[in-house]
Structures are given as structure tokens and as C-alpha cells.
Amino acid sequence: MKASSGRCGLVRWLQVLLPFLLSLFPGALPVQIRYSIPEELAKNSVVGNLAKDLGLSVRDLPARKLRVSAEKEYFTVNPESGDLLVSDRIDREQICGKQPLCVLDFDTVAENPLNIFYIAVIVQDINDNTPLFKQTKINLKIGESTKPGTTFPLDPALDSDVGPNSLQRYHLNDNEYFDLAEKQTPDGRKYPELILKHSLDREEHSLHQLVLTAVDGGDPPQSGTTQIRIKVTDANDNPPVFSQDVYRVTLREDVPPGFFVLQVTATDRDEGINAEITYSFHNVDEQVKHFFNLNEKTGEITTKDDLDFEIASSYTLSIEAKDPGDLAAHCSIQVEILDDNDCAPEVIVTSVSTPLPEDSPPGTVIALIKTRDRDSGENGEVYCQVLGNAKFILKSSSKNYYKLVTDGALDREEIPEYNLTITATDGGKPPLSSSIIVTLHISDVNDNAPVFQQTSYMVHVAENNPPGASIAQISASDPDLGPSGQVSYSIVASDLKPREILSYVSVSAQSGVVFAQRAFDHEQLRAFELTLQARDQGSPALSANVSLRVLVGDLNDNAPRVLYPALGPDGSALFDMVPRAAEPGYLVTKVVAVDADSGHNAWLSYHVLQASEPGLFSLGLRTGEVRTARALGDRDAARQRLLVAVRDGGQPPLSATATLHLIFADSLQEVLPDLSDRREPSDPQAKLQFYLVVALALISVLFFLAVILAISLRLRLSSRSDAWDCFQPGLSSKPGPGVLPNYSEGTLPYSYNLCVASQSAKTEFNFLNITPELVPAQDLVCDNASWEQNTNHGAAGVPFASDTILKQAPPNTDWRFSQAQRPGTSGSQNGDDTGTWPNNQFDTEMLQAMILASASEAADGSSTLGGGAGTMGLSARYGPQFTLQHVPDYRQNVYIPGSNATLTNAAGKRDGKAPAGGNGNKKKSGKKEKK
């Protein structure tokens, strides 16, 4: 025993020290395995036999579970042959781009034992990309005066391949005027240059078309082409020419600034840029430049300022036209000024009401406007209007006076300021006009409620958060100004109790930050919802509401709790009995535990911490089932002890321990000496149980007396003499219908029959049939024929007769434990779940005697049986219906002894079959219940 424990300790130390020793000796670490494949391999193509290269046997592959571990799995492992297969498209250009070396690194994992191997797959490039130019056609313009030897760089072709498969050379089709040279950028990319070999002549060839080809180094090589279109441009050898040498024009003095006067035009026989002409004033005084403007591109001449006949009656303008080659032409323009209406009206604003409230009604007077014109007659008549705004109009109040009024609703949030252009025009021909801009500021009123950025909010908060921590922030905006736009936040409603909400959360009135007032507990409160309000400071104040849902996340803050085995008064576990002839895999007992947490934190696992005989028992990792791992040996002790740890799935995990005491015995008589040696103190709850039994008995007696008193008062208050007929000698009845009471206050209505025999002192109170639904009241008569007639109208047509009342159905066996659930020596040997317990008459009588003895000894604390009063140191074994097949759930670990939730075998009674147990056993069970 000591030698085996020493070897186990040495193995544990080696498992701990092995990773550190391997890190000290890098040569001992696994070597990376490299493969080389071309890109674009078909799916399921074999890269290599990974199992063979790793030194793994094909027979061990199912147990080792060799697989690929990578973020994107381009490869997979055949579980049968161990071949490394291609599982996805491998495009070298997409994965590695232009890198010269493309390597896919990934890990492979093997279990039992767990090993990680490092694999590198070198992806070789194939010539799967054609060189391509950015443009299918390249347009160039070259002047005919360009000197030979001039170079013209061209855009390079693009080839996604690398190495020999990438772009290698360019070539140009045969021609007389151009040659091709290859250049290289600092980063190594090749690009072509076009070289002019001979001088160009536009009159001989105005257009040249070439074909440029890019070729890669693949086998076979691939190529791409583009067309080069060269247009020969002309040289500047012709000057501009005006259509006229002298231009004459007449202007009225009242023409406004910007008025079109004349457009001069010059032509050039050259082409392209050499034919572009610019116009400018030539040798003119500053007065001409002050009153006239010349467009240098179009030759348009416009007035620059108001003309006045009294200042100058004519102007002479000299214009020069010049091309890019400095070849020029000149002309002159004679401008004569005619006297006319040259006084524009004036606009004067006398008063302006600003700022203007945005809730001003239509027709509100804003300003008074006065107009004035120094001309007379029709030229002095002025018309005034507002330009470009439909919300304001001018109303004439008297001659030359106008009122500016509103003509629509205003909204400061839409337009906070208006720039109104008021124009006055006289009646001259052509008319003159002037304008003035009136700026109106719109003042704010509280006409907008706050608006939240989201329609609803949801936040996740982990439980056990620090009190005072911020868990969310809401934000609402109000387009109003000043106090009307200042928003404050508050909590107005919640699905919690009104007094509890302030103890859970609060909100900052200024920032909208929601704070936790206490630490949340996921087990008590998983989610709650708040209604938050944003309210501005306007008068009257406007508000808006939004919902905030808080989800409390679970943390691993609850340790597992062991439900079985239950601890005795001294804290020790109960005993379980195991047959000596138990085969390996025999279900001994089951450790049942629960965890108050949820999700992964409630996944429980069971582990053996200590065993008096290692290797004798095995423990289910997820089920908690304790089974025999081997048969009981001659040297194994009859009493065994297991220390079991229950851990949850949290990080870090929490755990609880339970101690199992197991006794190998074939009968109850063999267990008694072991149990008698282990005298336990009396149960501290025995006195409390005694008081509860006494209280229950008193309540039952009081209830029974109340029922008798109610029946007596009912009979005494009855005014009908025939209600006493049933108590006369013989059963008599009264003609006419009586009322059969329908007792339906519970979940199922019952029918009752109370009859008093004429020559007997017994009263039979028979529970008849359970009616599936409420039935109408029937007549109560005492003769047999009438009674049978009334009962035939009962629920669902259930027959009711005297022989039916006397016949009793066999007891339902659903209450019995299955063979796997019974304590004692039954174990799992008998597969009949309907068998009775105990198995023989001797065990039954012995067990009844022990129950009576332990019950009497529990009252004075002298019980010698382990496990507390009435337990006899034995515990019910849990059957295989608790086997955890899928993800563990703590609800599957809970079993309530005596509950019919896990008892099956109700089909035997439905089919009319008698239970498997004998009549003798049924009677003994009835005795136990009475005792």
C-alpha cells in the first residue's frame, strides 16, 4: 500500500516538473514538420501522411483523436489513414500577397496523452495570373517639335505571381518612330519607357498606334497587352486675328454694374493649346479699368460701376489678343454714353423688432420701411418687395411706406436667423432698383421635448459589482436654447417594488449616468427594467421616457452543495451496503450535488480525492455514480471509505467534499455488527419531530370534531322529517327528488355515500368514484333502485352498484422503489422494477423490528444505529435513471426519495395487471404503514 502511494506521488511530481525540464532543453521539444505544396490544390488532395511523419500508429488514431487546430482550417486530418488533406481553397496571392516565401503554420493536437505538434506548409506559386495593364488604351500627345531621344514613362503591368512566374519583360510592335526601354523602380518593379527615335511631322502623320505587350516567366508564359494611341500636336506658328479692327457701341448711363457691353473675338489657325487666346486691356487709363471689366477668356466686356454722362460721354478701349506663343493682335472699341434715368431708389428701415419669438402668429409687424427716388415721373415711382422668403411679406400702409409682417409659422430650431433682402424698383425704362438686407433673430420658446438617442437601452452587469459603480449612461438632446434645452434625468417607474428601486440603482440628474447602489445577486435578481425620464427646464416643462433593461450576469460565487450522501448529526456520511459478489461496473451509490449558480458555473464534476483502497471504485465525472472498478479481493477490507470532491465549472472553480462509507456484505445480518460498533449520538431533531407529530395529531382531531359538529348541526337544522329515514330500521326513502351534495372544493370532485345499516352499529362512509368534471346534483334516496338510478347519472357514466363498492382495486405499485433504488442487499441484480421490498419474509420481519427498535430508542437518544434516528445507517441507492447523457444540469442531480416523479410502472395498473409482488408482501407493507 505504501509502495503504490509512493509511486503515485513520484508520477505526480514528474508531471509537474516535465514542462520545466523541457523548457531547459530546447532540443527535447518537438521539431516542426514541413510540407511543400503548390497553390490551388483540389479539395481533399493529400499533402502527406501526418500520422506516419509524427510516428503515430494508424491503429492508435481513433484513440489519439489527431486533429488540426488553427484559426482558419485550410487542412484536415483523415481520422482513418492519418493523411493531411486540403480542406479549403489555397490562393497564395490572397494569403501571402507578394511575399517571396508563403508558409502556413498551424498546430495539430493528439490526445491520450495530450501532445501538440507544429506543422508548416510551404505554398509554392503557380503561374495562375496573367500580367494586366491598368488601362486597355493609353492616349499620348506629343508635339511635332519634340526632339528625338525624348522618353515617355508608361504605367507598368501588374502580375500577382512571384518569382519566375512574375512579370519579366516588355516588348513593342515594330514601328518607325518609337522604341521601348525597360526601367526599374527602387522597390524592384519593372516599368516601360517609350523613346522617340525620329522627329514627328503632324502634316505627314497626325496619329500613331502601337501595341505594348507584358510577358511573365511562367511555363508556358502568359502575357497581357495594351494599345498606345499617340496624337501629334501642332507647333505655334500662326498669330491671332480679330474679326474687326474697330468696334463701336452705345450705352445708356443707367445700365447697372455688370451690364454686357460687347464681346470681341479673335481666331488662331493653330490647334490645341496654340489656339488658346487670352484678352486684356492694352494702353488704357485707370478710369477705363474702373468702369469696365474684360473677361480674359471669352473677350466679354461688361460695366464695372455706374456710368454717369456728366462725368464722361465716351470711352475708348484698346484690346489685345495673345496666344501662348506670345503672338498678339490688337483692336479698339468706341463706347458712347447716353443720358437716361440714372437715379436708383433708396430703401430705409425705420424700426425693427428683433429678436422675434418663434411662436409669433402670422400678421405680426416686424419693421417699418420707407423708400425714396430722386427721379420724377415714372422713373420716381418705386415698387418694394421681399425676395426669396415666403414667410414674410410687405404691406403698403401709405405712399412710400411699407410694413414688414410675418406670413407663416416660424421655427427657431429649423431657421434661427433670417436675412431678408428688400428690393425697391422704380418705373423707369429700364427700371432701376436697390436692395437692403434686414437680419431677424428668432428667439426660442420651449416647444420641443427631449429626444433620447435610442428608443430603448439594455446593459449587462456582472453580479457582485461594487456599489456606486456606473452601469449605463443615457443621453437625450433638446434643440431648444437656455433652460428649455437643459435636460435632467430621473427614474419614474420600475418593475421592482417602489421601495426597492432606490436601493438598487440611481441616476445622475445632470449626466444621465446610472449607478448601482448595491451589489447585484444573479441568484436573487436576474433582470429588471427601469423607466427613465428626461425633463427640460422650460415653462411648462416637457419630458420624454425611455426604458432601460438591466441584465445581471452570473459569477461563480456559490460553491456546490452535496445533497447525498446526507451527513449525520456528527457530520459523518451514512453507510451503503455492497454485495461481496458485485461485478466490475456494479452501481454502488451516487453522489448528488447542486449549485445555485447557472450556466457553466453550475456544471458539476466529481473527483475522488482519497480512497482507502485505490482502484476498487470508479467515480463518474459528470454523473457522480460510484461503481465497482474490480471485484472485491481477499485482502480488501469489508469497510471502505471514499473522499469525493464536487467541483463546479467556474473560473476559479469552487468545490465541496463528501465522505462515503461503504460496507461489503451479502445480507443485513452481516451489516449489523459493523453498525453496532459505530454508536452515534441521538438526533438533535428528534424532540422537534416529536413535537411536530403531536401538533399534527391535535390538528387532525380538531378537524374531525369540527366535521362531526357540522354534520350534527346540519341534521338538527333540517326541517324535513324524511331526512332521518335512513336511521330507522331498514333503509327507507321518500318519494320525490332529494339533493345529492357535490363536493368539488378541491382540485377533483368526489362523490360520497353515507348509509346506516338497520342492525349494525357501524357507519360506512365510502369514497366512490372521482368524477372528471362537475356533475349536476342528484336526488338522495335510500332504496336501492332509486339510488342506482341516480348514480347512473353521475360523471362520465361510471357504474355504481353495491358489488362495485365492495370490490377494491389492487394497490398501486408506483410507490415502490425500483431494484436500482432500493437500499440493502438488492442492488441492481434484479431487473424487475415492480418487485416488493424486502425480498423475503425474514428480512421483512427483521427490518420491521429494527424500525420499531430504532424509533423507540430515538426518543431517549440511545439509538445504536448509525446515520441518525430511524435511518439505521443505510441510505437509498440512486438508480441509473440519473445517468447524465448530455450537458450536466444540477436539476438532474436532485432526487427526492418517496416522490412518484421518478417512479414508472403505472402502466401495469392502467392495463388491469396485478403488481408483481405477492399478497403476503402487500399485507406486510400495510402493517408497516399502520405501525
From Swiss-Prot:
Per the UniProt topology annotation, the Extracellular ranges are 31-691
- Keyword match Plastid: no
Query: GO MF annotations for this entry?
Result: calcium ion binding
Q: How does it sit in the membrane?
A: Single-pass type I membrane protein
Domain Cadherin: from-to ranges: 31-133, 134-242, 243-347, 348-452, 453-562, 570-675
Q: Where are the transmembrane segments?
A: 692-712
| Cytoplasmic compartment segments | 713-931
**InterPro entries (alphabetical):** Cadherin-like_dom (IPR002126), Cadherin-like_sf (IPR015919), Cadherin_C (IPR032455), Cadherin_CBD (IPR031904), Cadherin_CS (IPR020894), Cadherin_N (IPR013164), Protocadherin/Cadherin-CA (IPR050174)
Q: Which residues are glycosylated?
A: 419, 545
Keywords of this entry: Calcium, Cell adhesion, Cell membrane, Glycoprotein, Membrane, Repeat, Signal, Transmembrane, Transmembrane helix
Q: Which SMART domains match?
A: CA
Cellular component, GO annotation: plasma membrane
The keyword Lyase is annotated on this UniProt entry: no
Q: Where is the composition biased (Polar residues)?
A: 815-840
Region Disordered: list its residue ranges: 814-840, 901-931
Q: Where in the cell is it found?
A: Cell membrane
Which residues are the signal sequence here? 1-30
One biological process term from GO is: homophilic cell adhesion via plasma membrane adhesion molecules
Question: Which domain of life does the protein's organism represent?
Answer: Eukaryota
Basic residues compositional bias, start-end: 921-931
Protein purpose? Potential calcium-dependent cell-adhesion protein. May be involved in the establishment and maintenance of specific neuronal connections in the brain.
Protein name, UniProt field: Protocadherin gamma-B2
Biological classification of the source: Eukaryota, Metazoa, Chordata, Craniata, Vertebrata
The gene coding this protein: PCDHGB2
